From Swiss-Prot:
Residues 163-182 bind DNA. Keywords: Activator, DNA-binding, Nitrogen fixation, Plasmid, Repressor, Transcription, Transcription regulation. FixK is a protein that regulates nitrogen fixation genes both positively and negatively. FixK appears to repress its own expression and that of nifA. FixK may bind DNA at the FNR consensus binding site. This is Nitrogen fixation regulation protein FixK. The gene is fixK. Coiled coil: none annotated.
Length: 211
């Protein structure tokens, strides 16, 4: 299953993190890989900041397929949804530590939240453009460029998510993802250190594929 209904955080304690987009008291929770953070239909009364690890947000479609709508990396926040209940599932990809902010703190920090929400909205709009107009090579190139920028802009990229996650995010099959990665490698645009680590060999050439 993509989410276990009874999954709970492995440990929770009240403390303060280091630098964070929002100040004030928060809970800190650590989730094991694959653990559900919240489910579709759960009360929407918190927002979350990734301290370590990675999170996927997804929805299960009526035919049983999974559509991943976003990934969240250290320093990024998620959980912003309209309405009183969540419309998506959130799940830890790797062992993940989160700062969890309650509704009261969210209201007190509305200006900070607005900036974060707008950043998330811009990323979501860009993602819609990618999957709506680009071919498989362009989608994966855009995904790698975006992820690289979110990890600091260096030439080595660590993929916390699986190729199935990437396929479900980009609207592709896992076979297509593997073929495109191989094609980019053969063109010397990327090099694979292992299944989850990619060296960006020609960043400008990779970026040009996104246009």
């Amino acid at each position: 299953m993509y989410a276990a209904a009874q999954a709970k955080p492995q440990s929770i304690e009240v403390e303060h993190l280091g630098p964070a987009p929002m100040s004030g008291p928060r809970l800190v929770a650590t989730y094991k890989p694959g653990r559900e953070i919240y489910a579709q239909g759960d009360l929407n009364d918190k927002c979350y900041q990734v301290s370590t690890g990675a999170v996927r947000i997804y929805r299960l479609l009526s035919d049983g397929r999974r559509q991943v709508v976003s990934f969240h990396l250290p320093g990024e926040m998620f959980g912003f949804e309209a309405g009183s209940n969540h419309s998506f599932f959130a799940e830890a990809i790797t062992e993940t530590t989160l700062a969890i902010f309650g509704r009261r703190n969210m209201q007190e920090r509305s200006r900070e939240l607005l900036a974060l929400a707008l950043t998330g909205m811009a990323r979501a709009q860009q993602h819609l453009l990618v999957i709506g107009r680009q071919c498989a090579v362009e989608r994966i190139a855009a995904f790698l460029v975006d992820l690289c920028e979110r990890q600091g802009g260096g030439r080595q990229l660590r993929l916390p998510m699986s190729r199935q996650d990437i396929a479900d995010y980009l609207g592709l099959t896992i076979e297509t993802v593997s073929r495109v990665v191989t094609k980019l490698k053969e063109r010397s645009l990327i090099a694979l250190r292992d299944a989850r680590t990619i060296d960006i060999m020609k960043p400008e050439a990779l970026r040009s594929l996104c246009n």
